[in-house]
Amino acid sequence: MTTQISKKRKFVADGVFYAELNEVLTRELAEDGYSGVEVRVTPMRTEIIIRATRTQNVLGEKGRRIRELTSLVQKRFKFPVDSVELYAEKVNNRGLCAIAQAESLRYKLLGGLAVRRACYGVLRFVMESGAKGCEVIVSGKLRAARAKSMKFKDGYMVSSGQPTKEYIDSAVRHVLLRQGVLGIKVKVMLDWDPKGISGPKTPLPDVVIIHSPKEEEAIYAPAQVAAPAALVADAPLTAVDYPAMIPVA
C-alpha cells in the first residue's frame, strides 16, 4: 500500500534527493569532468542522466563503472531492483559550463599554478568558447597570511532580475591547499541563441533590435498615349476619327 504525502513534502523530498545525489556524483566523478545531473521520473523507472566532459571515463571499461554507480545509487536511496537507470551525456561545449571550468581551475591550483595565471587562462578559454561574459572570484589566503579576494572579469555580465536565472551559469568549488582553503566561484553569461542550443531562446529585455526597412517597389509613371483628335479641343477632324467621313467612290 502506497503512502500519501502532501505536495510540500514531495517537493522537499525531491530537492533533498537531488542535492544528495549531486553531492555523491561530484565526489565520485570530479576528475572526469562532472558537470551536473538531471533526474527524469517515468512510471516505469527513474532515469538519471550524468553530464560530463569525459563520458568514456564515466562509463568505464565495458560499462563497469556505470554499473557500479547504478548499484551505489540503488542501495543508497533504496530504489527497487531494476527501477533506476544511469546514462552518461557528453557536454558539447565545456567552455560554457561553469561547473567544468570551476573543476578545471581547482585542479590547476592543486597543481601549483599561480592564481592569476590560472584565472586568466580560464577567463580566456570561456570567452573564446562563445560566452558573452565571465567572472572568476578566488578568495582565501592567496599570498600573505591575511585572506583576501581576487576578482577577474571579462565581457558583459548581468547581476539582477530574471535574466540572471536564464543567462547565468554559476558554480562554487573549494580547494584545500597547504596554506588553507581557497574558495572558487565561476559565473558564465551565455549569449542569446534563437535556436536554444548554446544559450537561452528569450532575448534580454533591454536589447533593442532595429530591423532594416523593407525595400519599396518602384512606382513607374503611366505611359502617355496620344489622344484621338476628336477628343482634343480645336483639332481638325480626320477620317480616322470618323470613318463615315471617308468619301465613297
UniProtKB/Swiss-Prot annotation:
Stated name of the protein: Small ribosomal subunit protein uS3y
Transferase found in the keyword field: no
NCBIfam families, A to Z: PRK04191.1, uS3_euk_arch
GO CC annotations, alphabetized: cytosol; cytosolic ribosome; cytosolic small ribosomal subunit; plasmodesma
Keywords: Phosphoprotein, Ribonucleoprotein, Ribosomal protein, RNA-binding
GO molecular function terms attached to this record: mRNA binding; structural constituent of ribosome
Gene (name only): RPS3B
Family listed: Belongs to the universal ribosomal protein uS3 family.
Domain KH type-2: start-end pairs: 21-92
Native source organism of the sequence: Arabidopsis thaliana (Mouse-ear cress)
Pfam families recorded: KH_2, Ribosomal_S3_C
InterPro entries listed in its UniProt record: KH_dom-like_a/b, KH_dom_type_2, KH_sf_prok-type, Ribosomal_S3_C_sf, Ribosomal_uS3_C, Ribosomal_uS3_euk/arc
Listed GO biological process terms: translation
Transmembrane segments: none
Residue positions where Phosphoserine is found in the record: 212
Superkingdom of origin: Eukaryota
